[in-house]
Regions:
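Non-heme Fe(II)/2-oxoglutarate
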Residues: 1-26
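A short coil-to-beta-strand element that immediately follows conserved catalytic motifs
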Residues: 28-37
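Double-stranded beta-helix
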Residues: 114-166
Length: 166
């Protein structure tokens, strides 16, 4: 189980304040698109491997705010080499990653009492998002098939959006 203590003003302040760090890391201009947290996980929590929303979660970060000192809880993330990497964060540390491209999760149930993270998400200032016409209006295209993802990836992958080694 996870508990969300959302505070819009706080989250937007952090998103805007840390945007420059994310821009320096990925080497292009970003728009702050979404933030979550603080989110508290408790004993038994887990997170299935997933990729985030490509409309808003292109460049992402996780900031560990607090955790039970006795229990680590690694983030598993698949790199561009399809190898699983485990990332361990301590309070005050931040991990940057491409949330909509790299499969990630926490597959081992958490054994501690609490694990608190803040999640920040950005998208490039200039960014192609597939759209489809629905009853005379345009909406974002769902990326459900392998062809959809290949088309999306081909239009948005370049030297400026490749993965960074962590």
């Amino acid at each position: 189980a996870a508990y969300l203590a959302y505070n819009y003003d706080f989250t937007m302040l952090i998103l805007e304040s840390l945007k420059i760090i994310h821009e320096e890391w990925c080497k292009f201009e970003l728009i702050a698109s979404m933030g979550y947290g603080p989110r508290k996980y408790v004993k038994g929590s887990y997170l299935r491997p997933h990729a985030d929303k490509p409309q808003t979660h292109v460049i992402s970060s996780i900031i560990n705010i607090d955790q039970d000192d006795k229990h680590d809880w690694p983030l598993q993330i698949y790199g561009y080499d399809n190898e699983v990497n485990e990332v361990y964060l301590k309070p005050g540390e931040m991990f940057l990653y491409e949330g909509s491209k790299l499969l990630h999760g926490r597959t081992q149930p958490y054994q501690g009492t609490h694990f608190v993270n803040l999640f920040l998400h950005y998208r490039p200032n200039e960014y192609h998002i597939p759209k489809v016409e629905v009853e005379g209006a345009y909406s974002y295209k769902d990326l459900n098939t392998e062809t959809d993802w290949i088309d999306f990836s081909n239009k948005n992958t370049s030297e400026r959006i490749v993965g960074k080694i962590f």
